[in-house]
Amino acid sequence: MTYNPRIGGFTHVKQASFDVHVKRSEARPRTSFAQQIKRIFSKIGETLGQLFRHRAPDGAPGRVKLQGVRYVGSYRPTGDARQAIRHFVDEAVKQVAHARTPEIRQDAEFGRQVYEATLCAIFSEAKDRFCMDPATRAGNVRPAFIAALGDAARATGLPGADKQGVFTPSGAGTNPLYTEIRLRADTLMGAELAARPEYRELQSYARQQAIDLVANALPGERSNTLAEFRQTVQTLEATYRRAAQDASRDEKGAANAADGA
């Protein structure tokens, strides 16, 4: 698949063999990260367009309507809303894995782009999660966390730049496969379930499933790097959250001492 600037999209190009494809992609200049993300979403858009234009194949999950505490339709669990929504998220993950795993493994350039986009998504989500939490305001913990997070991202080999002494990946954002999973899940479950609060609560689960999907499709070295980065980010979050708690206690202690003086 080749980007055509005249039409603002991608066209299919026959390749003689996988080896030839790899050599050609190695010879091409490295595109900007924004262009890479555009290519990934273009692929996803083509697939989702087909999904919306055609009926679901036999055996695919039917849409579900709420009737009290039970759900009607085929190929679905009965019970509470959370159980039903989890079912459709899992089904969406299976469909995306079926569609994208061969592409990630066979298209070297696409696989690299998805890999880097997933690392950037982990970085962005961790930064937002930590810095938007009121519990991390105390002390000077947030800048220290961002600096440590940037060092961890740099160690993966991600493209990026130093901004005021802190490394920032050049393509921070949302995992494109998570976006595809969510859109597919929306289609499978229908508007009524998609509007329920249980669906929003399961988005963290869907994000983790998207990362697992990419990790399982990548070659061993990149899969290991992805797993190590996830673990490093979790460790950093736990460490700096404890530091924020300690700083908050110290500030409260100092304030109480001043009041008692």
From Swiss-Prot:
Keywords for the protein's UniProt record, in alphabetical order: GTPase activation, Guanine-nucleotide releasing factor, Secreted, Virulence
Residues in the signal sequence: none
InterPro entries in the cross-refs: SopE, SopE-like_GEF_dom_sf, SopE_GEF_dom
Alphabetical list of Pfam families matching this protein: SopE_GEF
GO cellular component: extracellular region
Biased composition (Basic and acidic residues): 241-253
UniProt GO MF annotations: GTPase activator activity; guanyl-nucleotide exchange factor activity
Gene3D superfamilies membership: SopE-like, GEF domain
Region (Disordered): 241-261
GO terms, biological process: actin cytoskeleton organization
Cysteine pairings via disulfide bonds: none
Localization (cell): Secreted
Main subcellular location: secreted
Assembly, per entry: Monomer. Interacts with human CDC42.
Free-text function comment from the UniProt entry: Activator for both CDC42 and RAC1 by directly interacting with these Rho GTPases and acting as a guanine nucleotide exchange factor (GEF). This activation results in actin cytoskeleton rearrangements and stimulates membrane ruffling, thus promoting bacterial entry into non-phagocytic cells.
Stated family: Belongs to the GEF (guanine exchange factor) SopE family.
Official protein name in the record: Guanine nucleotide exchange factor BopE
Source organism: Burkholderia thailandensis (strain ATCC 700388 / DSM 13276 / CCUG 48851 / CIP 106301 / E264)
Upper taxonomic lineage: Bacteria, Pseudomonadati, Pseudomonadota, Betaproteobacteria, Burkholderiales
Gene: bopE
